[in-house]
Amino acid sequence: MPGLHQNAWVVGERSSKLKVFGPEGIDQFTQGIEMAYAHDYVFRNEHHGDAIAPLQFAGFDTRVIDLNNPVIFDNGELKITAFKVIHEPIEPALGFRFEYKGRSIVISGDTSYTQTVIDNSMNADVLFHEAQANHMLAIMEESLRSRGADLLATVLDDITTYHTTLVEAAEIANEANVKKLFFYHLTPAPRNYIQEIMFVRGVDQVREEWTLVEDGTLVILPVGSDEIIVTNM
């Protein structure tokens, strides 16, 4: 976020502050970034001038999402809806549904298995769902404890309680009648083909249509079509 907001200001020819939508507490986050960059804003403006780094457009225009009014953007073509997910003790944690001219994408955000993802993913073209291989974490935890690294082992055990396994995410996609499931935010991230095979263990027994994303995975939904194009940036 810090780098994005700075680059969009200096080289992005932004004509307003960067709009950021988020749950309660997002304003504290963006204010903290603005405080950290306060001198940088001035220095860049003095160096580059208003044409490149106008001070009036530095920083954020922060919007706190009201979950009682979950549609955070709707211009008649693009509609973005926020919904609450379960990632305790983080509260609130949000997922998002994007709808554009008959096509739809849902992003789960960080969450354990939760009904709200199913409800908000109904008949979506694409669901991006976080995925954690607890069976691999268990192996890592056992190895760490055998070497006396109990603190790190406990961390690995702790994170199993607030994420979703791949099989659970596949079941969510099935329940919601999602056309294509993409696993993202992979934990532990597989580094090679053998690890990928271990990572996705059990998914094929639950669902056929799924993809394990990589950095640069690009999903395109042509308007007026049911096609889902998967490529790389």
Task: Label the predicted regions.
Residues 1-106, 112, 193-232:
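Binuclear metal-dependent hydrolase catalytic cores
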Residues 9, 148-152, 233:
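Generic signal for short, ordered secondary-structure residues
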Residues 95, 104, 112-215:
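Cap/insert and terminal regions of metallo-dependent hydrolase folds
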